[in-house]
Regions:
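Alpha-helical bundle segments that constitute or directly flank the non-heme di-iron/ferroxidase center
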Residues: 56, 61-63, 136-168, 234-262
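Acidic/His metal-coordination segments adjacent to aromatic residues that form catalytic metal sites
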Residues: 124-145, 205-245, 265, 304-308
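Long, hydrophobic, well-ordered secondary-structure blocks that form the structural core
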Residues: 136-216
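Extended alpha-helical coiled-coil scaffold domains characteristic of the BAR superfamily
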Residues: 150-153, 184, 233-259, 280-286, ...
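Inter-helical turn/loop segments and adjacent helix faces that build the functional surface
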Residues: 162-176, 194-203, 230-238, 257-278, ...
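Alpha-helical scaffold segments in carbohydrate-active enzymes
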Residues: 176-197, 250, 278-293, 321-324
Length: 371
């Protein structure tokens, strides 16, 4: 009888044993070591909003957390988002918060609501044959002038804000300008679709007339020149200031609010004001963040005087240009059959709006506004 076999011995795996020491970063005391919450920024209020959580510090900055410096850049220029891309200065660009608190969800929600409302209005207008009540003079006015304004909105969205929203030093600013860009492009698209709708629904409406008006009509060449010069502005803050503060107040609000929305109903048109009103609502939101940003810069403890001087120079450059563009639009005030407000009154209201904005920003009013 053979002896029982010895059981096979198990081979033990060799791996290093963990050693716990107090010599590493875990043993250090930080200001937030005892905190039960985590925040890498100081919120504007007691608690951080969702807007701040998803927007703040998304864009890197060597002054905050990016201790190794810029990790990418352009082949023919500096890395990242240099502060030198604008003549304005700030002790802390990260102080800016968009008063509209726009982030991904609100962008989709707000624009979807606007498009839905406009589409419902257009559908209702077709069902009610609302366009048949338009006067011939008003039909021609919309055909030529509202169509021409579409080019201004598209140019500002695609060539001013599309470029500017990549240039500011913080994501909070760039995000606000990106939403501004979306507003302009959506409104331009709304006007284009409205033009197609009228071409199909309104007999005698020439849906292609706006091209010749924008390119050749002397009345619109001042606006066109102003828009094209805005697209060439290299300083992102100058482009934003000259567009949202100067051009929009003196030309945009003048045309949209003080002309189209004032006289459309008297000419049998209740549809166009609802469309143009959505664009005016967008601008009011965009003016809100612009005011907040430039007020922060003009009241900067260290650079406020410098910034007011720079902005004053931009006013001297852009206000005469926009005033000239506005005055060249004067003949279209006499085109509709029913007119309720003279150009001088509309223009004075537009200039009053600009004066109010400049007062909020602690900026001196240019002499041209009093002429």
């Amino acid at each position: 009888m053979t002896a029982p076999a010895e059981p096979a011995t198990k081979s033990e795996r060799s791996f290093p044993k963990p050693e716990f020491t107090d010599a590493e970063a875990g043993a250090l005391e930080f200001p937030s070591s005892g905190s039960r919450s985590y925040n890498y920024f100081t919120p504007a209020k007691l608690r951080a909003t969702t807007y701040e959580d998803v927007t703040f510090d998304v864009q890197p900055d060597p002054a905050r957390h990016l201790s190794q410096g810029w990790i990418y850049g352009f082949g023919d220029g500096p890395g990242g988002y240099p502060h030198e891309w604008t003549a304005l200065k700030s002790t802390d660009w990260h102080k800016f918060r968009d008063p509209n608190e726009e982030w991904e969800q609100t962008i989709y929600r707000n624009n979807a609501n606007a498009v839905r409302q406009i589409q419902q209005n257009l559908d209702n207008a077709k069902l009610a044959d609302a366009y048949n009540s338009w006067t011939p003079a008003w039909t021609k006015f919309v055909e030529r002038n509202l169509g021409a304004w579409m080019h201004a909105e598209h140019g500002l969205g695609l060539h001013v804000f599309m470029a500017a929203q990549r240039s500011a030093p913080t994501n909070m600013i760039n995000n606000a300008m990106a939403v501004n860009c979306a507003h302009k492009l959506r409104f331009a698209q709304d006007l284009a679709l409205y033009n197609l709708d009228l071409s199909e629904s309104l007999s005698g409406f020439d849906g292609s007339a706006h091209r010749a008006v924008w390119q050749d009509d002397a009345v619109w060449q001042g606006v066109r020149r102003n828009v094209e010069l805005l697209t060439a502005a290299g300083d992102w803050a100058e482009a934003l200031f000259a567009t949202n503060v100067v051009f929009e107040q003196l030309v945009g609000v003048l045309f949209r609010s003080h002309l189209v929305m004032q006289i459309a109903a008297r000419n049998g048109d209740y549809v166009t004001p609802s469309l143009v009103g959505s664009g005016e609502h967008d601008y009011n939101r965009d003016l809100g963040y612009s005011r907040a940003l430039f007020a922060l810069l003009t009241r900067d403890e260290e650079h406020g005087a410098h910034n007011r001087e720079v902005l004053g120079g931009w006013l001297a450059k852009w206000v005469p240009l926009s005033i000239a563009a506005a005055r060249e639009l004067q003949p279209i005030w006499s085109q509709p059959q029913e007119r309720t407000i003279p150009f001088a009154e509309s223009f004075e209201a537009a200039k009053s709006g600009l004066r109010s904005v400049l007062a909020d920003l602690d900026l001196d009013q240019p002499e041209e506004l009093n002429r």
